[in-house]
């Protein structure tokens, strides 16, 4: 199975649903089209997911352990996921956590992004970042009701990742982070020499280019993107000596199609 919520470019087909509603309710059509967010929908969906899909496909016997991990991952979504700490926090064995995570990944209920590394100093090389499949479940599990402006950024990051995975399915999407905490949201190796990087910002004016600059000191070749919910065409600008293309997800998708067809 593959859980595919309504994507950024599909919102006009869903009664021109406002973006903030998409972030809050999530992208499952029943939730997205509902006039109000109903907590019971998300709880019942998570409970039935085990019986409907997980137990049938993987023969797990303990729904409580699985659902505890699933909810824990939802709360961690958008952050680093350390397996040993997760097992300790939940009182579950490490092998059980690993098996359940594989099931969640196989069913596309979560995405684990592995760190990009190779040429930099003191890079994170093992710990993955975890993203739940849908922003509605993230906001539900975190108790974000209503959303605050501080919540928009991490949910927007999820929506961008969903778009990247749907439209750039041939690329391996990773993230980058160093020991100082500098981080690039998404890293896409294009070939052995070129690496594209993507930062997601709800407000493009709040971009701090420090991490991009450090990354490019190690990996100089590749395109730099800043993806924000813009209603205007994409544009290029220079920031801290870097050429950065600023656009909404559609703008990134158009550039991707141009590169596929050999255009510049």
Where are these regions (language model features)?
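Interdomain hinge/linker elements that couple catalytic modules in large macromolecular machines
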Residues: 2-179
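A cross-kingdom feature that marks ATP-driven nucleic-acid transaction machinery
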Residues: 102-103, 109, 114-264
């Amino acid at each position: 199975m593959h859980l595919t919520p309504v994507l950024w470019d599909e919102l006009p087909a869903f009664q021109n649903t406002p973006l903030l509603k998409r972030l809050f309710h999530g992208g499952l059509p029943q939730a997205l089209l509902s006039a109000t967010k109903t907590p019971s929908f998300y709880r019942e969906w998570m409970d039935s997911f085990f019986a409907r899909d997980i137990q049938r496909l993987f023969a797990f016997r303990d729904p409580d352990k699985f659902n505890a991990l699933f909810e824990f991952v939802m709360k961690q979504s958008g952050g680093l996921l350390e397996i040993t700490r997760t097992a300790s926090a939940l009182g579950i064995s490490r092998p059980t956590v690993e098996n359940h995570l594989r099931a969640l990944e196989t069913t596309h209920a979560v995405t684990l992004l592995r760190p990009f590394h190779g040429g930099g100093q003191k890079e994170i090389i093992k710990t993955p970042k975890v993203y739940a499949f849908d922003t509605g479940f993230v906001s539900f599990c975190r108790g974000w009701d209503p959303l605050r402006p501080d919540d928009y950024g991490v949910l927007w990051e999820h929506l961008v990742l969903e778009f990247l995975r749907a439209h750039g399915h041939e690329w391996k999407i990773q993230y980058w982070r160093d020991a100082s905490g500098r981080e690039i949201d998404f890293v896409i190796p294009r070939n052995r020499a070129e690496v594209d990087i993507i930062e997601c910002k709800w407000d493009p004016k709040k971009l701090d280019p420090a991490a991009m600059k450090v990354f490019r000191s190690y990996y100089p070749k590749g395109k730099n993107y800043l993806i924000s919910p813009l209603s205007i065409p994409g544009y290029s600008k220079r920031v801290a000596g870097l050429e950065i293309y600023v656009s909404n997800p559609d703008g990134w998708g158009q550039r991707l199609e141009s590169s596929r067809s050999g255009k510049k």
